Amino acid sequence: MDCLQMVFKLFPNWKREAEVKKLVAGYKVHGDPFSTNTRRVLAVLHEKRLSYEPITVKLQTGEHKTEPFLSLNPFGQVPVFEDGSVKLYESRAITQYIAYVHSSRGTQLLNLRSHETMATLTMWMEIEAHQFDPPASKLTWEQVIKPIYGLETDQTIVKENEAILEKVLNIYEKRLEESRFLACNSFTLVDLHHLPNIQYLLGTPTKKLFEKRSKVRKWVDEITSREAWKMACDQEKSWFNKPRN
């Protein structure tokens, strides 16, 4: 019995009931459409063609650090995801929840055919979170977010983190010589989790790190061209002017 069959055996009724409920009622997403973590969740919702209600949290005014938002996430960070009585924060936990509940709908974002494929998927999700994201997030902050707030980019930090990111991308280049995507030959949460920072960095000088590696460049071109991701980045359609459920 493979991993997916075991999960279904353990939670068959919960999963079916949960999926039906969400298709009817939709979800609530508290966040900011320009936030990398919020966009990560929106991308999964669009890949799964799911209904959701966007609720704007005004980061500029510090709304996320005050009540009532802190009652949703005591760490004061976006996004927060509401599914009835279930309230989740941490974007990667949210994406996995959605991908599992709706595993039979839309894009198959989990590779659970065997213990090995499940472990490989999990390994690459950890690599994204602990190897790629730290330097990528710092580079996004320095080159994209700070200028928005009128703050000066620290070029020393940029240089240091580009050097770290280069080492990560060298490993990615080698991996992508063997596989179309990072976890396997199909698009999964692993690739999706990279999208928010990559999208912002493509508008900065750091873009060169992705472009000078042929396999990485091809991978980036493919994942950033997905329709679900384009929708997640279109804040007018996916957030501000989105019809309420």
UniProtKB/Swiss-Prot annotation:
Could you tell me the EC number(s) of this protein?
A: 2.5.1.18
GO biological processes: toxin catabolic process
Q: Which GO CC annotations does the UniProt entry carry?
A: cytoplasm; cytosol
Q: Tell me the ranges covered by the GST C-terminal domain, including all copies.
A: 114-244
- Domain GST N-terminal per the UniProt entry, residue ranges: 25-106
- What is the annotated localization of this protein? Cytoplasm, Cytosol
User: What GO MF terms are annotated?
Assistant: glutathione transferase activity
Q: Name the enzyme group at the top EC level.
A: transferase
Q: Which of UniProt's keywords are assigned here?
A: Cytoplasm, Detoxification, Transferase
Q: Where does glutathione bind?
A: 35-36, 64-65, 77-78, 90-91
SUPFAM superfamilies hit by this protein? GST C-terminal domain-like, Thioredoxin-like
InterPro entries noted in UniProt:
Glutathione-S-Trfase_C-like, Glutathione-S-Trfase_C_sf, Glutathione_S-Trfase, Glutathione_S-Trfase_N, GST_C, GST_Phi_C, Thioredoxin-like_sf
Catalysed reaction, written as an equation: RX + glutathione = an S-substituted glutathione + a halide anion + H(+)
Q: What does this protein do?
A: May be involved in the conjugation of reduced glutathione to a wide number of exogenous and endogenous hydrophobic electrophiles and have a detoxification role against certain herbicides.
Family stated for the protein in its record? Belongs to the GST superfamily. Phi family.
The entry's protein name is: Glutathione S-transferase F4
> Which gene name belongs to this protein?
GSTF4
